[in-house]
Amino acid sequence: MNRFFGMLLVIAATLAGLVLLSAGFYLAAGWLGWGFNALTGWISGSPGVSRAAVYYGASVANVVTLLLVVLMISSSLLTVAERKWSALIQNRIGANRIKVFGSALGGIPFLAADALKMLTKERIETTGRTRVLYELAPMLAFAPVFALFAIIPVGQGIELNQIPGLAGAAAAGAVEQIALQVSRTDTGLLYLFAIASLQVYGTALAGWASNNKLALLGGVRASSQMISYEVSLGLSLVGTMIAYRTLRLEEMVVAQGTPVLGPVPALGLLLQPIGFLIFFASAFAETKRAPFDLPEGESEIVGYFVEYSGMKFGLLFLAEFAEIVVLAGVITAVFLGGWHPILFEGWLRQNLTPFWFAAVGAGAFIAKMIVMMWLQLTIRWLLPRFRFDQIQKLCWKLLLPAALVNVFVTGGALLLDPSGQLLAWIGILTIVVIAVLTAAVGRAPAPAAGHGAAHAAAGH
Amino acid sequence: MPYQLENRPPDLRESMYFPEIIRGIGTITKHFLKNLFFSRDANPDILARKRGGFGHSDNVTLQYPEERAPYAPAYRGLHRLVPREDGKPRCVACYMCATICPAQCIYIEAAEYPDDPVEKYPAKFVIDELRCIVCGFCVEACPKDAIRMDSGEHTPPSYERSAQIWDEKRLLRGPPVSYQYDPWLRRGSPSIPPDKLEEMRARAKPFPTVATDEASQTPGFSVRALAAEAKDRAQAARK
C-alpha cells in the first residue's frame, strides 16, 4: 500500500510540476519577447512597441523551452520509459541497476548511461558508402520531426501585460499574444503534411547510401510504407478541417472548447472518432514502430540503419521517439481538446488569473501528451508486426476507403446542420458501435482444460 | 495446455482490427496499472508469492544476487564426507560409491588405522567434480551414510581444472553424525579415546526413517524451519 500512495503522490507531483513548468515557459516567452522588443528598439533608436519583435522574441524562447525541453527531454525519457513500461506490462521490474544514493529513481539514470554509450562508441564507416548522403541521412531523419513540433499549440495565447512582472509592458491588443507555440502559421495542417512527408527521405537515404543490400531493402520498405500511409494520414484530417473550418491548430483547439451537445465540448474525438482512429493508425505507421516496423526487422533484414554506429545510429533511434512525441502532440491538439483542461474548466477560468489558467492549460496539454505517448508504447508492446502485404492491404483497402467515407459523411452532416450537432450525434453513434463491437465476444473461448482438450493436443 | 485452434479466415469484426486492439489495450492496461500501483511481495519463494489479486503486483522477478530462491529439500549440492564426532570420516573405504558411480569420478585408496585391526579408512578419497553428473547414486549406495550431497552449495568455480578435483581434506566437513548402530560405537575402538567414545555414544541417535530428517541436518538449511515459516505465513494470511 505504501507504493500505492507513493505513486499517487508521484502522479500529483508530476501534474503540479507540469503546471509550474508551463508557468515558467510563459514567463520565459513573455520576458524574452519584451526584452527582444527593448533590444530592437535600442538598436534602431525608436523606442516603442513592435509587434514583430515581441513575436520573434517569444518564438525564440519557445524554441528553447518547447523544442529543446519538452520535445527533446520527453523523447529521451521515452527511451527509458519504453523499457520500464514494457517491464510493467510484462510483469517484470525493468532497468533498475544504476542506483543514485541507493535509489533506482525509476530507471531514469539510464538516460545518462545510454547517452554516454552512444557518444563514446566507435564509429565504423563502410568504404562503399555515399559519403554526403550517408552523413546527411540521420539529420534528415531528425530535422523534420523537430520542425513538426513548431506548430503544436502547447499553451493558449495570453496578453503580454498579463504575465507577472510585465503588467506595464503593453496594453492588451497592442502586441501579439504570448503563446506556447513556436510558429503560428496560416498553413497549419498543410505545413504538418508537408514536413511529415519529408521524413521518408531520412530513412530512404540512410538505406540507400549505406551500400548495403539489407539496408537498401529496409529503406525501400520504409519509403513504400510511409508514402502509402501519407495518403490516409492526410485524408483522415480533412474531416477535422471541415468540422472546425480552419487549418490552424490553435484555432482548432479553441473551437474544441465550445459546447456542442449541452455542456459537452466539441472535442475532435467526439466529432471525428473514425478520423481519430485512422489518423492514429496512419501516424503510427509513419513512426515506423511496431506493429509497423517493417523497415527494421532483426530476423530478416536488420534495418535501414544497419551501417550506422555510435551517435549516428542514436540519432536515427531518437528520431523515432521524437516522432512519438510529435504524434502525441498533434493528436492532443486536434482530437483531445488541446490545452482545454476539460474537467472543472469553467471553475478554473473564473478563479484563476489568466496567466495561471494558461499555465494549467499547458500543463493539461503536456499531461494529455504523456497519456498518448503511453498509449503508443502500449500498442507497440501489444501487437506483433504486420506482414508487408498486410500493411499495404490495411492502408489501401481499409484506412483509405474509411477516410474517404469519413470526409463525405462529415461534409454531408455539416451541410445539413452547420451547428455540428448532427455530426456530434453521428460521432456518439460511432463510438457506441465500436464499444459494442469491442465488448462482443469474437472468437470462441479456449476449450476447458479437461480430457477432451488433452486429446486435441498434438502428439497425444 | 495446448489446444487446437480452428483454422478459419477472420470474421468482419476481426478484420476491422480496432475492436480487438482496444480489447488488447484493456488487458495490458490492467497489468500495467496493477504493477505500477502495487509493490512486489518480498517473499523470495516465487511459488509462495502473493500476486495477481488486488493490492499485489503480478511481478514474478527474483532480484537474483540479493534474493535467492530456497533450494528444494532434495537438492543435490556439493558432496561432503560426513565426519564422526572425533573428526575422522565415517567412510570405511568399501568402494560402494566408486563402484556405482556412472561417471567413475570417485577414486578411493583404502588404509587401516594403525591401532585398530578392524576399521578401514580412506587414505585418499578424491571426487572429480567436473566428471560428476550429480546423480546422487553414491549417496544412495553408501552403507554408512558417509557421503552426502546435503551441503546446499554449488561447486564453486575455479580458474584451473585441477581445483575441481576435491580430495578428502576438502570433502570432510559439515556437522558430524553418529548412529547407534555404528560398529565403532558398539564395540569401541582403540583409535577413539574412551571419554570421546562415551560422548559419541551419548550423541548417537537411531537411524532416520523419515527422509526429511536427513535434509534437516544440512547446515544453513532446514526443512523444519521452512515448514514453520510456511505455517507462520499461512497463519498471518488467515489473520
From Swiss-Prot, chain B:
It is a peripheral membrane protein. Its EC number is 7.1.1.-. Binds 2 [4Fe-4S] clusters per subunit. One of its GO terms (molecular function) is 4 iron, 4 sulfur cluster binding. It is found in: Cell inner membrane. Its cofactor is [4Fe-4S] cluster. The keyword Cytoplasm does not apply. Residues 81-111, 123-152 form the 4Fe-4S ferredoxin-type domain. [4Fe-4S] cluster 2 binds at C101, C132, C135, C138. InterPro entries: 4Fe4S_Fe-S-bd (IPR017896), 4Fe4S_Fe_S_CS (IPR017900), NADH_quinone_OxRdtase_chainI (IPR010226). It comes from the Bacteria. NDH-1 shuttles electrons from NADH, via FMN and iron-sulfur (Fe-S) centers, to quinones in the respiratory chain. The immediate electron acceptor for the enzyme in this species is believed to be ubiquinone. Couples the redox reaction to proton translocation (for every two electrons transferred, four hydrogen ions are translocated across the cytoplasmic membrane), and thus conserves the redox energy in a proton gradient. NDH-1 is composed of 14 different subunits. Subunits NuoA, H, J, K, L, M, N constitute the membrane sector of the complex. This is NADH-quinone oxidoreductase subunit I 1. The gene is nuoI1.
